[in-house]
């Protein structure tokens, strides 16, 4: 049998019958021994898993990142390795894909809607936004959807903050800490900790995501109760308050010319239809880096936000959950919280 994984209750997921073993007795057939996934992202396994979930990889040996050994089949193996961690963050959320048809990182493009020839494992449909307009969307339901994205040369998965079933009620907010070029990563880490502490003081627990680029996202899970307007207003007011309080460190305006030596606290990812990089997604950046959830303790010891490639990220996904408690957090954005930051 080829299969993607064995679940905690012992069930086999995405199994595909490969044939009878005439060389072994039934008593000799045992479960495979776990190995270090980070060093064992086997492209042959990736190709097999893709077939098992119903996706045929064209050109599985094609290099996806210049000057690396990472092929399309490697990416399929990577997403199989991190699927258990990633799917809760992406399943049924409207998303955007960043694709790179030439695989040189020079002409990447966003895709938000279905296109002819798209694998059927990526789903498409429509939903009504809060302004009453119809929006065409894409979403993913399982590992087959992730690997369908790989087949399309997708290098990044960006997600809405809401589920497609309740599109008017966000389930998270994101503060994207985007530093000026050349600003030391220590400043980025300190900004993340300061944002965490302020959020914590008003009653919101948060978790850090190293972006795979140069910044950190501070992510706050929410019960789907406050609407998009309230969430975006809160994030804008929060960013503007920090910019007013510490103008030498923060700016709430996205102008790069005005950002010199400071951090842009990007709150714009918190509107309906806006997206942020999905945890565990690869990035369209040199080296095949990944956006990885980390603990606050782990973040403290890091010297950059692009320290995980697909091999290191796959290995980390097999360890303890850095975001333990994230999906169990019972917190909502209250009127009192909004009043605190609106000054």
Give short role names for the model-derived ranges.
Residues 219-231:
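Catalytic palm subdomain of template-directed nucleic-acid polymerases
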Residues 98-100, 206-212, 253-257:
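Short beta-strand
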Residues 196-209:
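Active-site palm subdomain of RNA-directed nucleic acid polymerases
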Residues 186:
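Portal/gating segments that form or line small-molecule/metal binding sites
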Residues 93-125:
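Polyanion/phosphate-binding surface patch
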Residues 1-77, 84-87, 91-92, 132-134, ...:
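C-terminal accessory nucleic-acid interaction domains of nucleic acid-metabolism proteins
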Residues 210-220:
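Short, conserved phosphate-binding/catalytic loop or strand-edge motifs used
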């Amino acid at each position: 049998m080829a299969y993607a994984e064995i679940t905690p209750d012992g069930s086999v997921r995405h199994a595909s019958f490969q044939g009878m073993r005439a060389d072994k007795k039934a008593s000799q057939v045992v479960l495979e021994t776990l190995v270090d996934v980070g060093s064992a992202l086997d492209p042959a396994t990736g190709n097999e898993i893709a077939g098992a979930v119903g996706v045929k990889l064209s050109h599985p040996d094609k290099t996806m990142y210049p000057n690396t050994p990472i092929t399309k089949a490697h990416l399929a193996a990577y997403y199989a390795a991190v699927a258990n961690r990633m799917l809760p963050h992406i399943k049924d959320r409207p998303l955007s894909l960043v694709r790179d048809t030439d695989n040189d990182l020079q002409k990447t493009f966003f895709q938000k809607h279905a296109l002819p020839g798209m694998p059927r494992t990526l789903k498409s449909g429509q939903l009504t936004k809060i302004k009453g307009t119809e929006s065409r969307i894409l979403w993913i339901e399982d590992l087959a959807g992730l690997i369908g994205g790989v087949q399309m040369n997708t290098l990044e998965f960006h997600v809405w903050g809401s589920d497609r079933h309740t599109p008017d009620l966000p389930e998270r907010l994101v503060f994207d800490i985007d530093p000026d070029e050349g600003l030391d990563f220590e400043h980025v880490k300190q900004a993340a900790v300061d944002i965490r502490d302020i959020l914590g003081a008003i009653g919101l627990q948060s978790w850090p995501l190293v972006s795979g680029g140069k910044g950190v996202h501070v992510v706050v899970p929410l019960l789907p109760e406050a609407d998009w307007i309230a969430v975006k207003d809160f994030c804008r007011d929060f960013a503007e308050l920090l910019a007013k309080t510490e103008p030498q460190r923060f700016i709430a305006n996205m102008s790069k010319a005005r950002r010199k030596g400071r951090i842009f606290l990007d709150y714009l990812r918190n509107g309906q239809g806006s997206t942020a990089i999905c945890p565990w997604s690869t990035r369209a950046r040199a080296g095949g880096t990944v956006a990885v959830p980390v603990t606050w303790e782990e973040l403290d010891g890091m010297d950059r936000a692009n320290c995980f490639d697909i091999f290191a990220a796959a290995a980390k996904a097999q360890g303890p959950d850095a975001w333990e408690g994230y999906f169990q957090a019972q917190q909502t954005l209250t009127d009192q919280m909004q009043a605190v930051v609106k000054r």
